[in-house]
Every structure is written in structure tokens, then in C-alpha cells.
Amino acid sequence: MAQAMLFRLNLRLRAQNKPPFSVEADSLRIPDSALCVAAGQLLTSVSEPWLVNHCLRTFLWATILGKKEHRTYDEELLFVGSALHDLGLTDVGAKLSTGRAECFAVEGAFAAEAFLAQHGVADKRRELIAEAISLHLNVRVPLKHGVEAHLLHAGAGLDVVGARYRELAASIRDEVVHLHPRIEMKNNLVALMKQQSRARPLSRAAFLCSHGFISMIRHSAFAS
């Protein structure tokens, strides 16, 4: 047991001694396939500016962390999942999903799947995106659910509560926020989560809020 403890301690120390990860600023781009453009148009047409920027930053954080972890992933799937992962928080998302879920993440997954079906996306790809969106509120999303789901969760977690914030160089963190400003993200998201908790007391949002999620948002390393 002592050897195992020393091994884990050594891994932590090695991780702490690694320099923060970064990428070239010109690699921070939004993919421009027809499906990505359509997803981006849907996002901007139904979401407030702060939520649009959150979804775009989620994608960029996800791609940066994917490079850090040396992951191979489908860029189009990851972008569409990131762009639409909070669709359940919008009026259009609720209509597309036909109100079938108690949780906004699951409702967003239904809505995204309906949007993808309208654009002729194959069943398997629709299912991968829908599952990634449905799972993004979980505490952890292991790789067994797909690299895209794992990275979407990581990107959203970084943007919302600052998870893995210090793993990235300050320069690249600043560049992402410069490209897509936070626009009072903390205050806006806290208000929205409280609203979700009241409207859907059995949802994951309500569960998370009852277990310190609001405080985690407010005390993340981001300024706003």
C-alpha cells in the first residue's frame, strides 16, 4: 500500500512540474463544413450572445485539451456537439425536443438529434452527438462514451467551473476569451441554473445546484 501511495504522489508531483500546455493561436479556428455552419447558425439564432460565446469557447477548450491528451476525434462532431450542447436552454430547443425530458441536457440532445435528422446526418453520428450532449452535465464522462463526449465535457467544465484551468498557459486562455468574450458568463449562468432548478426540481441542474454548483461557477478562476 505504501508503494502505491508513493507512486500516486510521484505522478502528482510530475504533473505539477509540467509547464502549462499551449497551442498556436492561429490554430484556434471554427470548422466550416456545411453542417458546422448550419449548427453555428442555429446556435446564434436562438441563443443570447453570452451563451453563443460559451458554446464556441467550449469547442476551443475541447480541441486544446484534445491536443494535450493526444486524442484523435471527429472535429465536425465535436463542433456540432459543442455548439448545440445547451440547446435545451433555449425556446427553440424545447420545441425541437417536443418537451420529452426533465433535464435540459437530455432535452438538448433530443433537439440536436432532430436538427441533425433534418440535415440528413446518419443515425450513428446523430446518436454520438446526442449522447455527448446528454452526458455533458455528468461529473465525469469516461472515454468509453466516445472521445467527442469526453472532450465536450472537458471543454464545458473548463469554461463553466474552471476545471483544468491551470493546465493551460495563460496566453492561450487569454486568447480564447479574447476571441469569444465571456460577457458576464458567471452571473448569466447562475441566473439560468437557478431558473432551471425552480422549473425542474428533479433535474441534474437542480441536483448540481443543491451540491455547490453555483458556488463553483462563481469562484472559478475566470474573472466573469
PLM ranges: what are they?
Residues 33-37, 41, 49, 123-127, ...:
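Generic alpha-helical secondary structure signal
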